[in-house]
Amino acid sequence: MASNLPMSPQLEQIHGEIRDHFRALANGFQRLDKIKDSTRQSKQLEELTDKMRECKRLVKEFDRELKDEEARNSPEVNKQLNDEKQSMIKELNSYVALRKTYMSTLGNKKVELFDMGAGVSGEPTAEENVQVASSMSNQELVDAGMKRMDETDQAIERSKQVVEQTLEVGTQTAANLKGQTDQMGRVVNHLDTIQFSIKKASQLVKEIGRQVATDKCIMGFLFLIVCGVVAIIIVKIVNPNNKDIRDIPGLAPPAQSRKLLYLRNQDYM
């Protein structure tokens, strides 16, 4: 359906580039399913992310061109082109969601395995604890239990502080990353706008150049006609009896000199 839409050459070129990127994304995700190595999967995902970023830029450029040509198209054509734009946006969003799924799966695979080898522990065994407890009085047992509880409470408090500090650092890092992401988004949008303006300016310069060349040709042709007319007028004035040159319409030939007949009086009588 999209190939039969009435598009300008500029819109058709952008639309073709977007469709090429979509085909590359589909093939890339199919290859990703066959890759088992995590490092190669990460590299493949980075390449697909770059293609999705380029797709996003092209969709924005397609939207700008569509708005620029909206006044020259019929309402029906504008509706069809807008529907095609929404379809491309949905397709791009589906690839973005698929990328997030693969990123989550890849992150779950990166789990470190610890070797829990059997070794000599520095903690006393249960048998040793029973022997020590049997030799202690009740007050000593209470004091030892309170000391162990205090140590446990202190360890829990230290763990809470570490968790709070980690959350604070994570929140600050997320805020910084969000600010940097927003700034990069604004920079990308600004660059897209500049690129679009440069293309429009180039098209305008080409159009002006064609108009100037046409005007020069017309002026040169008119100049040759004027020179020819002036040359014919000069030749007719200098040599009025030249029959090889036809008279110019609207230009009367030079008046003949009058010849008066002189008669003598007696001849007249």
UniProtKB/Swiss-Prot annotation:
Residues 33-94 form a coiled coil. Vesicle trafficking protein that functions in the secretory pathway. Its main location: membrane. InterPro entries: NPSN/SNAP25-like_N_SNARE, T_SNARE_dom. The chain crosses the membrane at residues 218-238. Residues 1-217 are cytoplasmic. The modification Phosphoserine is found at residue 74. Residues 146-208 form the t-SNARE coiled-coil homology domain. Belongs to the novel plant SNARE family. This is Novel plant SNARE 13. It is a single-pass type IV membrane protein. Keywords: Coiled coil, Membrane, Phosphoprotein, Protein transport, Transmembrane, Transmembrane helix, Transport. GO terms for molecular function: SNAP receptor activity. SMART domains: t_SNARE. Residues 239-269 are vesicular.
